[in-house]
């Protein structure tokens, strides 16, 4: 953002939302002009106030990442169908890869989360979801592959004891979105800046969602692909999601 300010004269006042919902409200209440979300949260912002897709970050030629469900190697669980009667930890209900896509995979496997899972733990984050598994509090856990691989590298997860149970299809990298009410000339200037900033600065300064190093930003990522990914969540309706959250509240 500092580089874009210096080169293109577009100034930013960066603020961290207290929650996924707060980040959406900030854009839709016109307290923010640009937001950076997961795909699901972007979908909410688009539905509520017509947030426009600005860009997704690209790493090693890929503009997607993956969600996963994990379990211990001695759990006896070898397929998603075998989660029936087991316990599952997930992240925040608005999280694309630690809640929404994992439950979409569970539903696709014929499992009704609220009825068929013994217990659901809403851990609140990828890290906490993984911790619930490694500490033996649940049979399986959901988190992004990035979070899982980071936990393995840090020694939090012992790969000799835990395994990937299921991996999602590619999920669009967390998109940058713009308030639709911005002036057209400013929108064009912002798009140009994000599309070519990687050619103007040292590559180590190009950062993606969460601060990871990326190659560039793709400002021409098709909206149809973003919406297509969100369509895969169609079975996870508001009713089903409500039942899951209610189940998680049971003691």
Predicted regions and their residues:
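Beta->alpha turn/N-cap motifs
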Residues: 16-20, 30-49, 57, 142-152
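Extracytoplasmic
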Residues: 9, 29, 37, 49, ...
């Amino acid at each position: 953002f500092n580089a874009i300010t210096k080169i293109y004269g577009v100034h930013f006042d960066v603020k961290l939302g207290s929650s996924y919902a707060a980040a959406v409200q900030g854009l839709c209440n016109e307290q923010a002009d640009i937001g950076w979300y997961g795909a699901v949260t972007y979908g909410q912002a688009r539905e509520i106030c017509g947030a426009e897709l600005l860009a997704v970050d690209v790493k090693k030629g890929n503009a997607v990442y993956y969600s996963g469900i994990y379990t211990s190697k001695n759990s006896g669980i070898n397929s998603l169908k075998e989660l029936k009667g087991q316990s599952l930890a997930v992240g925040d209900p608005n999280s694309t890869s630690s809640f929404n896509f994992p439950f979409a995979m569970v539903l696709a496997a014929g499992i009704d989360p609220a009825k068929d899972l013994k217990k659901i733990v809403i851990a609140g984050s990828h890290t906490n979801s993984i911790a619930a598994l490694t500490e033996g509090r649940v049979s399986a856990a959901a988190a992004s592959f990035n979070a899982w691989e980071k936990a393995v590298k840090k020694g939090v997860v012992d790969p000799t004891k835990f395994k990937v149970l299921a991996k999602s299809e590619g999920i669009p990298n967390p998109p940058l979105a713009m308030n639709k009410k911005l002036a057209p000339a400013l929108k064009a200037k912002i798009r140009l800046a994000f599309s070519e900033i990687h050619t103007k600065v040292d590559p180590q300064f190009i950062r993606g969602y969460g601060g990871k190093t990326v190659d560039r930003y793709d400002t021409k990522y098709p909206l149809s692909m973003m919406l297509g990914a969100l369509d895969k969540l169609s079975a996870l309706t508001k009713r089903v999601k409500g039942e899951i959250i209610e189940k998680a509240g049971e003691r």
